[in-house]
């Protein structure tokens, strides 16, 4: 099986230079996504997984948000013509707004090989189980567990996510190739001030074959 995994598109205007009213950093992003489409058409993957943060900013005016949704729609639609199936997952709420993803869902209701996912679920496709774990709103968990320190909060959130993953695992076919699709930081990594990643052994629920994630 050939899989194309991508994430963190961050479509939208960013701080930077412009030319004739066109934000050049935003245009660079679209140029990169068009190159992604070109590669997909050449490689013809069986499955495209888009692991969240499609948009750069959630809280923007409706007109601009609509324009960015249309830009995302065009890229996803082109990917759907190049691939067998496409799964697009919502990332973190500060980037991927609920409103934008609801609009995106509407565009693909009649496109059978595209699924837009905003809640944890398992998607089964011809012997492949994709366990999809979208980003979450920390504010929801902080309201549920108020007054926790940073370490306690991380421990509680890790436990909550672990329980969700275990639940998804029970929904996967026992003989299926299983893929975990998520939008979370890998424990042991710190990339806030650089590009060096330190990976340490972690305990995790065994999901056979593959994991695709983003941050």
Model-flagged regions — what are they?
Residues 12-21:
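Conserved P-loop NTPase mechanochemical-coupling segment
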């Amino acid at each position: 099986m050939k899989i194309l995994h991508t994430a963190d598109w961050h479509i939208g205007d960013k701080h930077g230079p412009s030319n004739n009213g066109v934000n050049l950093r935003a245009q660079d992003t679209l140029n990169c996504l068009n190159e992604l489409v070109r590669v997909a058409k050449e490689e013809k993957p069986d499955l495209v997984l888009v692991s969240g943060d499609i948009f750069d900013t959630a809280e923007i005016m409706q007109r601009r948000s609509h324009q960015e949704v249309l830009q995302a729609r065009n890229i996803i639609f082109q990917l759907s013509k190049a691939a067998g199936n496409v799964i697009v997952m919502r990332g973190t709420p500060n980037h991927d707004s609920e409103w934008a993803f609801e609009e995106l869902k509407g565009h693909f209701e009649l496109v059978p090989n595209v699924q837009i996912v905003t809640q944890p679920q398992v998607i089964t496709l011809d012997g492949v189980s994709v366990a999809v774990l979208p980003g979450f709103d920390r504010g929801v968990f902080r309201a549920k567990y108020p007054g926790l320190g940073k370490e306690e909060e991380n421990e509680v959130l890790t436990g909550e996510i672990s329980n969700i993953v275990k639940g998804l695992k029970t929904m996967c076919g026992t003989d299926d190739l299983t893929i975990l699709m998520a939008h979370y930081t890998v424990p042991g990594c710190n990339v806030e001030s650089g590009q060096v990643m330190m990976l340490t052994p972690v305990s995790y629920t065994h999901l056979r074959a593959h994991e695709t994630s983003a941050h």
